[in-house]
């Protein structure tokens, strides 16, 4: 059966890197495809003598007015029961601005409004808001290096396919550095007593045994973890049955170094003990400690 991956998302979030990664994975790749051509591409691929089994196409706002029909095309593909996945790449506004300044490229919507990069990014985000809701996979590239993005795509579209299982990612983060854009579920653990205020623990992380012991010794932590484990283990099979291919669970504390790290590690162990494959990412663990 023909497999189609449609790549979209914010300009500057890494779509060009992504399409090159798909080419390396053996996909037939098309960049800047008007959405109206998607159903036709699927028909042509099925009719070719040299069988094309996997297609990756970038569809984004460079298509101008043609892009306005993207949502209708996605609905048509779903209605026709086409085997496609929608990948949405995102990044925080300040990261996108920095990338544009470094490359000195113009944003596709820079001709609208006052011409500022920020306004163009905000307009694009509004245009893509509905499209993002259709995404099977959302990746926040704000903190990813090109090789990290390539590895993540390989994990989703090659390794995961062989396992036929949901890709589960647990992320710890600090609220002071912003919410992760690609999280499906966010849990706030700032109610747990903070090791930061213990002099001997301040400069350690939630991976250190002393910090783990401190975080896990409280009754409120024990009760929360049991409720969290029950909820997540209930949700995973139900999400999988619904066809969800990716689940990103974010655990947040103030700075992302102590409580969230410990809780994320405990959650990973519990899910893995049920036979699921889990990856973990401590987004802010290397950030400077400032309280």
UniProtKB/Swiss-Prot annotation:
GO terms for molecular function: ATP binding; GTP binding. ATP binds at residues 9-16. Disulfide bonds: none annotated. GTP binds at residues 60-63. The keyword Phosphoprotein does not apply. Keywords: ATP-binding, GTP-binding, Nucleotide-binding. SUPFAM superfamilies: P-loop containing nucleoside triphosphate hydrolases. Pfam families: PapZ_C, RapZ-like_N. InterPro entries: P-loop_NTPase, RapZ-like, RapZ-like_N, RapZ_C. Belongs to the RapZ-like family. Displays ATPase and GTPase activities. This is Nucleotide-binding protein Athe_0320. It comes from Caldicellulosiruptor bescii (strain ATCC BAA-1888 / DSM 6725 / KCTC 15123 / Z-1320) (Anaerocellum thermophilum).
């Amino acid at each position: 059966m023909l497999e189609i991956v449609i790549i979209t998302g914010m300009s500057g979030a890494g779509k060009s890197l992504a399409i090159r990664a798909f080419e390396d994975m053996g996909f037939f790749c098309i960049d800047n495809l008007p959405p109206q051509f998607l159903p036709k591409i699927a028909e042509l691929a099925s009719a070719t003598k040299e069988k094309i089994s996997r297609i990756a196409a970038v569809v984004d706002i460079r298509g101008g007015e043609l892009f306005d029909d993207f949502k209708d095309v996605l609905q048509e593909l779903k209605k026709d029961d086409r085997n496609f996945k929608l990948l949405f790449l995102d990044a925080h506004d300040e990261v996108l601005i920095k990338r544009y300044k470094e490359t000195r490229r113009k944003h596709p919507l820079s001709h609208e409004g006052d011409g500022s990069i920020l306004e163009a990014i905000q307009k694009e985000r509004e245009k893509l808001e509905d499209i993002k809701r259709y995404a099977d996979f959302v990746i926040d590239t704000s903190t990813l290096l090109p090789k990290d993005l390539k590895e993540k795509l390989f994990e989703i579209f090659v390794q995961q396919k062989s396992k036929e299982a949901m890709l589960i990612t647990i992320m710890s983060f600090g609220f002071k550095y912003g919410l992760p854009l690609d999280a499906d579920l966010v849990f706030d653990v700032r109610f747990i007593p903070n090791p930061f205020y213990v002099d001997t623990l301040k400069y350690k992380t939630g991976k250190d045994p002393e910090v783990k012991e401190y975080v896990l010794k409280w009754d409120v932590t024990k009760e929360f973890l049991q409720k969290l484990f029950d909820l997540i283990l209930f949700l995973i099979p139900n999400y999988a049955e619904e066809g969800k291919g990716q689940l990103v669970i974010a655990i947040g504390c103030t700075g992302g170094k102590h409580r969230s790290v410990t809780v994320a590690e405990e959650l990973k162990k519990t899910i893995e003990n049920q036979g699921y494959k889990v990856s973990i990412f401590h987004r802010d663990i290397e950030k400077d400690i400032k309280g």
